[in-house]
């Protein structure tokens, strides 16, 4: 049994050794033909790569020409719309509110009737004052007649000088009483007039603060309604203290500074007004000063407490060199642009910028009118490289075509 097992192991080992020897001989016989093929392929690939780099397409870019323009200079700040006047309408007399003569949100004019207090008690008080005045006027008339008689009798010594003086004093006293009566009549008339509550200013009324039937008094703080004057309307915004000198100089030069109100996103112009005044002190916590501008607001585009972006035109720079904002780049050395020569070679040019907005930038130094600058395709540029200047629509087609050709090559492969 032991001898048969040893024989089987010897056969298995022999088979394995024979298989290994066959594989080694077969691999050695194929390697001399495969190696030359690989070696021949490598030079071909390298040559193809060099040929592709040498014959590759030029980098497509878009370009614009520097021009001269009259560029406005704006000072910008954040602001809030405020009513030119805000008035809380209160009653000046105590009484029962019997009528409201306005609709909430209505535009009213100064002097329009807004509310009515029950006038009954004030009419009674006026009638009493008028009655007392009439009574004292009759007393004065009688005293004056007696004084005239006393004066005639005094000439014949039928009355004493003392009696004449006493009658004169009575006349004077009655005249004083009448003056007081006239004041009482005027006061009663005023109380009656005040029972009719009118609009002190023109503007838009808000929501009513009290309903008809309530007893109101002059001490009520909430009042009856609030009127906000929106024609005209004001805008209060802030500017850095470094801009104060510019604004003051423009005012001293007699310029009317135009202020534009833009919406919250700064994308839509709402209205246009003029500078009204500057505050008399700087806020030490923010280093800013408050500016007030006034707008006619006839179209009601501005509303009290509305948040807006303010832009104030302070000057206009004439013959300024202007390029699109997309052409100006920022690097370690500062602002620069890529300039194109007549042969469409690009070179980096350092520039000094001035006034700028979302679309254009004023170049204070480094460029002249007529220079061509790259506005798109900048990330593919190197110093001295030759480029292909294309139109915007051409650039879009060129950007799509390589991917399409690559897809076709991949399909064939």
Swiss-Prot record:
Topology class, membrane: Peripheral membrane protein
Keyword Transport carried by entry: yes
Origin: domain of life: Bacteria
Keywords tagged on the record: Cell inner membrane, Cell membrane, Membrane, Repeat, Signal, Transport
Record GO terms (molecular function): efflux transmembrane transporter activity
UniProt cross-references to Gene3D superfamilies, sorted A to Z: 2.40.30.170, 2.40.420.20, 2.40.50.100, Helix hairpin bin (1.10.287.470)
Biased composition (Basic and acidic residues): 397-413
GO CC aspect terms: efflux pump complex; plasma membrane
Compartments (UniProt record): Cell inner membrane
Subunit structure of this chain's protein: Part of a tripartite efflux system composed of MdtA, MdtB and MdtC.
Homology family: Belongs to the membrane fusion protein (MFP) (TC 8.A.1) family.
PANTHER family, A to Z: MULTIDRUG RESISTANCE PROTEIN MDTA
Entries under HAMAP family matching the protein: MdtA
Protein name as annotated: Multidrug resistance protein MdtA
Organism field: Salmonella heidelberg (strain SL476)
């Amino acid at each position: 049994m032991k001898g048969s097992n040893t024989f089987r192991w010897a056969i298995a080992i022999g088979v394995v050794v024979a298989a290994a020897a066959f594989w080694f001989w077969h691999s050695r016989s194929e390697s001399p033909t495969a190696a030359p093929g690989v070696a021949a392929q490598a030079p071909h690939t390298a040559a193809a790569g060099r040929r592709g780099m040498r014959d590759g397409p030029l980098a497509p870019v878009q370009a614009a020409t520097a021009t001269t323009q009259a560029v406005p200079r704006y000072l910008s700040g954040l602001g809030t719309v405020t009513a030119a006047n805000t008035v809380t309408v209160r009653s000046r007399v105590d009484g029962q509110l019997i009528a409201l003569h306005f609709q909430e949100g209505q535009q009213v004019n100064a002097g329009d009737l807004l509310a009515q207090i029950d006038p009954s008690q004030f009419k009674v008080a006026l009638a009493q004052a008028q009655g007392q005045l009439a009574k004292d006027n009759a007393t004065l008339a009688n005293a004056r007649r007696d004084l005239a008689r006393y004066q005639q009798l005094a000439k014949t010594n039928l009355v004493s000088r003392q009696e004449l003086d006493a009658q004169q004093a009575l006349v004077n006293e009655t005249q004083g009483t009448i003056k007081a009566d006239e004041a009482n009549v005027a006061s009663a008339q005023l109380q009656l007039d005040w029972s009719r509550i009118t609009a002190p200013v023109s503007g838009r009324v808000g929501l009513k603060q009290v309903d008809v039937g309530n007893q109101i008094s002059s001490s009520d703080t909430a009042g009856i309604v609030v009127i906000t004057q929106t024609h005209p309307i004001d805008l209060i915004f802030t500017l850095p203290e470094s801009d104060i000198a510019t604004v003051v100089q423009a005012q001293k030069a007699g310029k009317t500074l135009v202020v534009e109100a833009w919406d919250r996103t700064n994308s839509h112009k709402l209205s246009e007004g003029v500078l009204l005044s500057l505050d008399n002190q700087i806020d030490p916590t923010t280093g800013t000063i408050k500016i007030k501008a006034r707008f006619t607001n006839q179209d009601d585009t501005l509303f009290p407490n509305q948040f807006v972006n303010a832009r104030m035109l302070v000057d206009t720079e004439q013959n300024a060199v202007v390029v699109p904002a997309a052409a100006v780049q920022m690097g370690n050395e500062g602002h620069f642009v890529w300039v194109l020569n007549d042969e469409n070679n690009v070179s980096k040019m350092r520039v000094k910028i001035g006034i700028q907005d979302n679309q254009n930038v004023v170049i204070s130094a480094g460029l002249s009118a007529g220079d061509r600058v790259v506005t798109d395709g900048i990330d593919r540029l190197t110093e001295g490289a030759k480029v292909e200047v294309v139109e915007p629509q051409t650039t879009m087609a060129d950007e799509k075509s390589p991917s399409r050709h690559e897809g076709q090559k991949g399909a064939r492969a």
